[in-house]
From Swiss-Prot:
Descriptive protein name: UPF0494 membrane protein C750.06c
Species this protein is from: Schizosaccharomyces pombe (strain 972 / ATCC 24843) (Fission yeast)
This protein's record includes keyword Transmembrane helix: yes
Family under the similarity heading: Belongs to the UPF0494 family.
Ranges annotated as spanning the membrane: 107-127, 144-164, 178-198, 199-219
UniProt-listed InterPro entries: DUF999 (IPR009340)
Pfam families to which the protein is assigned, alphabetical: DUF999
Cellular component GO terms, alphabetical: cytoplasm; fungal-type vacuole; membrane
Membrane topology, record value: Multi-pass membrane protein
Keywords linked to the UniProt accession: Cytoplasm, Membrane, Transmembrane, Transmembrane helix, Vacuole
Cellular localization per UniProt: Cytoplasm; Vacuole; Membrane
Amino acid sequence: MSNPESLKKQVEPPGYNELFMVEDVCNVDLEQGLDLCKPEKVNKQSQRSRQSRQSLFTNTIKPQKDKMNIKTNKIKEFLNDPFTEFSKFHNSYYPDGRISTRSNFRWPLLIIWSIIIVFAVDKKFEVQKFLSIWINENRFYSEIWVPIAIYVCLLVLMLLSLIFFAEFAVLALRVTGVIIAVLGAVLGMIIAVLGMIIAALGMIIAALGATITGLLYFGHWALYKLVILSLGFKIVTPGDVCVSNTLPTHNGETALHSETTVGSDIEQIELQNMPTPVKK
């Protein structure tokens, strides 16, 4: 019999004996004997359940929006990449501030360019000769000062034009570069369309070639049939042959045979394999 003291010393789960002393039996941890109806735990569990419900709600409703966002982002990247590459290329070849207003070499460069332009204009149109004739007729002629004044006036005009129109010239160059790039893109699209048209023509030509090949093959097959039928031959299908279709013929070839030739070949092979009788 079991000793009552030993029964008392047996290990029992904590709080098992106090189970019915707890007010809320449904919220009791049977292993630890603790009351689970604590406000902190209840609040945490309610918050977790709410968060899980919200996450399930958002995960069930928002995937389509996420897919749309991914597609739009891919389209934006596909459109932005060529634009950024073109802008880098264009900025490398047509940078801003090619004529810098803060450079120390601005005025000497402008003066040098003005002198070069004045001499080019004078050589082409003979401005000094024309103006000297006009001044001589009006009695303001001087062999030294008039040409100098003419060149100085031209130099000042060229210098002022370079000062005020340099930025416009740079912008004009950039705009022309953009125009050239756009024209090149349009030409590339036209060439791509022509390539597609050529590809379509190639497909049409390939289809015509396939039809011509099919017609030739059909004509060859019809001629073969006519020749076979006119010469009195019979075409044996593989289903009509009861043995292997690689049976050797009398001529040493491998071909299909009629029923009569197959039977004769089988008889010859059986006769060859039979043992020869021994003469006594």
